[in-house]
Amino acid sequence: MVDNRTVEQRLAAVAASMTMAGYTMTKADREESRRILRGEVSADESVRQVLADAGRDAADLVGKTAFRRLSELESSRPLTVFTRETLLATHAYLCGDVYPWAGTIRTSEVGAMGLAMCRAAYVDQELDRLFRRIEQSPPSATDREAALNTVAEHWGELTIIHPFLDGNSRTQRYFFDHMLRHAGWSLDWRRIAAAEVHAARYVAAATLDSSLLVDALRPGLSTGEDCPQLPTEPAAVLFHRMMEFRRAHPHESFHKLFFADKQSDKLRQPARDNQNG
């Protein structure tokens, strides 16, 4: 029997993927995910019930099936091989209940966060180039910062390559989470703002600066004492804030400066209120 702490930690990882995909899990969704994570029901059985409801629209259907598949993956044997083939297989598993093209490279142009992604004609070769880098530069098993920097760089590159028409965020969160896990690290997504990670991925994709993604992931590998205040804004808002912050404060930490300033504003607010009163 899986203990409740493990179930909740895995549920947070599933919910993070879905948040990045623009799908907010309902209370009922979370309870169904827990049932799968506990082994009380199989993902296959749960997905069959969803697919039997012909009244759902495609976007809702893809979200409902994907979180169930992610729940099963999170409760199964961890991913230990990080190749083009395992990325495609992961995508096929997560999205194949709805998309017949799941697990295949896109052949049309796409964009996200107002950015044009890699041209479809170059996705194949760029994906091969990235996976050569991943093979040559796995995350450190002894240096936390080095491990985060390596994964953030790879993640930013895969974000701009954007190999699939849909389902990139769900697949990539699982893929890079397990890459860190395989190196001996564990991300606790209860202590990470998924929207911030999502925004920072696109900053890394647009600028080749993955430091904000490192900032966003670091709290999940930190002790409670050094866990910074986490942002609550949507990913699209955070993306623009990050881009502005990066231009104004190059090489500075988004968390250390931006959120420290927000905290200072809160501390100053009572003083202003007292003056007004």
Model-flagged regions — what are they?
Residues 1-277:
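FIC/Doc superfamily catalytic core
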